[in-house]
UniProtKB/Swiss-Prot annotation:
It catalyses: 2-hydroxyisobutanoyl-CoA = (3S)-3-hydroxybutanoyl-CoA. The lineage of its organism: Bacteria, Pseudomonadati, Pseudomonadota, Betaproteobacteria, Burkholderiales. GO terms for molecular function: cobalamin binding; methylmalonyl-CoA mutase activity. The gene is hcmA. SUPFAM superfamilies: Cobalamin (vitamin B12)-dependent enzymes. Disruption phenotype: Insertion mutant cannot grow on 2-hydroxyisobutyric acid (2-HIBA). Changing I90 to F/Y: Loss of activity. InterPro entries: Cbl-dep_enz_cat, MeMalonylCoA_mutase_a/b_cat, MMCoA_mutase_a_cat. This is 2-hydroxyisobutanoyl-CoA mutase large subunit.
Length: 562
């Protein structure tokens, strides 16, 4: 069933042609439009106006109702009328104790979920006393080497009452092992713990470039995380398949959406090869997207993603459980849009991006601090960012009605166009040999780089306005702003604890277990998670584990693409 009978559609199209020729034509002689053509950030043409004729061919069942397949209007029947989105401001700097204080501050301000950023050594699997870590310990995230660090990070936080998200990828399974070990040590029922580990390694090869091992063993690690969690962490999201970093690397919103779903397909294929049915693990798959500057395009993107995901899971993978077809996503406002000139304007940018995320049906949200173009956000910036979410939730009324932009001719037309283009890209990926092959060939990387270059040219020419940068520019010789300070004692404090853990552990036991881990890694039918959990309990460091597996897997070196 479609929106309109063909005769009514034809009448509307005729009426619009008449309007263009008469009212529009006459008015343009007096007041020309601002530019010849209008496009979204993602290069979708934008018409002057939209009517029911523009969505006449969209099946009504593709729009549907919230909480009903294909979930275009939202994954749940009551959405924010029952519970508003999780307000999950990210934090991470210094040692576990330092970040723990920020967590507690944000919780006291009304935050409802925890999100953690890690420093570069932790992300790349180096201990804090490794030469490669020099100058980086705790600088751009929290340093985590051992289970003792995880204990400090989450001290006095009830893990059964608040969900914890870890933004980490190549070494994600080790962080998850520490989290599980901590949960067991505290006596929690693991099936009551909720949260997310990002663990999306494929987008690292595409965009963020934080990887350790070659692609095949890295995808195996993701498989092991998902299969272990499906059996042992029933409420935990074992992966956050991320378009955010693809966007921040310079992609279009369409590329962000399509490339993320290409990665999804690869992961689901790998897990189902183990014999696990999609309904056994898909209900806990989660996603992470950006909310960019084009308000209506972002809303349409989120709606189209839900529709595409539902169809992929049902039609391609044979999902029968509706929970396997609901796309749930965390959203973050676009860090790449933040500016140093006139930095307080970032509050307005972030507010609009947050609103589009909410109107697009996000399950959790991080709003960027106004100072994040300079450094890690200060407490004041994070409080302002959190208050932004709270005002949207409590004062604006947008949380009181589900999918209020549903039925908008423009939004519905753009949603359907997004769906069409996403599936076209996915078909092209299949024809070219699949996601992994195209990563190895640099196809995704080149697509992202080309769009990023086009965007840079548009900013440089002024075709893409950026207030304070190429429009309404002020002469600011020195921008004065209080930024988050780096504590120069961080590395010393962190390294001291790591070395203490090494000194107190049973070294022979740890080395024997590391040798066992090599055997498990060589046997792809086995899962790395159980032994990794025992290793961190025994005092093994992240660096111990990562370096041991480099011995059999090696490291990844990207082939440059021009």
């Amino acid at each position: 069933m479609t929106w309109l009978e063909p005769q009514i559609k034809s009448q509307l199209q005729s009426e619009r042609k008449d309007w263009e020729a008469n009212e529009v034509g006459a008015f343009l002689k007096k007041a020309p439009e601002r530019k010849e053509q209008f496009h979204t950030i993602g290069d979708f043409p934008v018409q002057r106006t939209y009517t029911a004729a523009d969505i006449a061919d969209t099946p009504l069942e593709d729009i549907g109702l919230p909480g009903r397949y294909p979930f275009t209007r939202g994954p749940y029947p009551t959405m924010y009328r029952s519970r508003t989105w999780t307000m999950r401001q990210i934090a991470g700097f210094g040692t576990g104790e330092d970040t723990n204080k920020r967590f507690k501050y944000l919780i006291a301000q009304g935050q409802t979920g925890i999100s953690t950023d890690f420093d570069m050594p932790t992300l790349m699997g180096y201990d804090s006393d490794h030469p490669m870590s020099d100058g980086e310990v705790g600088r751009e995230g929290v340093a985590i080497d051992t289970l003792a660090d995880m204990e400090a990070l989450l001290a006095d936080i009830d893990l059964e009452k608040i969900s914890v998200s870890f933004t980490i990828n190549p070494s994600a399974w080790i962080l998850l092992a520490m989290y599980v070990a901590l949960g067991e040590k505290r006596g929690y029922d693991l099936n009551k713990l909720s949260g997310t580990v990002q663990a999306d390694i494929l987008k690292e090869y595409m965009a963020q470039k934080e990887y350790i091992y070659p692609i095949a063993p890295s995808v195996r690690i993701v498989r092991d995380i998902i299969t272990y969690s499906a059996k042992n962490l029933k409420r935990y999201n074992p992966i956050n398949i991320s378009g955010y970093h693809i966007s921040e690397a310079g992609s279009s919103p369409l590329q962000e959406a399509a490339f993320t779903l290409a990665n999804l397909i690869t992961y689901v294929n790998e897990v189902t090869k183990t014999g696990m049915h999609v309904d056994e693990f898909a209900p806990r798959l989660a996603f992470f997207f950006v909310s960019q500057g084009d308000f209506f395009e972002e809303v349409a993107k989120f709606r189209a993603l839900r529709r595409c995901y539902a169809k992929i899971m049902k039609e391609r993978f044979g999902a029968r459980n509706p929970e396997s077809m609901r796309l749930r996503f965390h959203c973050q406002t676009a860090a790449a849009t933040l500016t140093k000139p006139q930095y307080m304007v970032n509050v307005v940018r972030t507010s609009l991006q947050a609103l589009s995320a909410v109107l697009g049906g996000a399950q959790s949200l991080h709003t960027n601090g106004y100072d994040e173009a300079f450094a890690i956000p200060t407490e004041d910036a994070m409080k302002m960012a959190l208050r932004t979410q709270q005002i949207i939730a409590e004062e604006s009324g947008v949380a009181d009605v589900i999918d209020p932009l549903g039925g908008s001719y423009y939004v519905e037309a753009l949603t359907t166009e997004y769906e069409k283009k996403i599936f076209e890209i996915l078909e092209e990926v299949e024809k070219r040999g699949g996601t992994i092959k195209l990563i190895e060939q640099g196809w995704f990387q080149k697509q992202i780089a080309d769009f990023a270059y086009e965007t840079a040219l548009r900013k440089q020419s002024g075709q893409k306005p950026v207030i304070g940068v190429n429009r309404f520019v002020e002469n600011e010789e020195d921008v004065k702003i209080e930024i988050h300070p780096y504590d120069n004692t961080t590395a010393e404090r962190q390294i001291s604890r790591t070395r203490r853990v090494r000194a107190e552990r049973d070294e022979a036991k740890v080395q024997a277990m590391l040798d066992q881990l090599v055997a498990v890694a060589k046997d792809e039918s086995q899962n790395l998670m159980p032994l990794t959990i025992e290793l961190v309990k025994a005092g093994a460091t992240m660096g111990d584990i990562v370096e041991k597996l480099k011995g059999i897997w090696g490291t990844y070196r990207e082939t440059p693409v021009f």
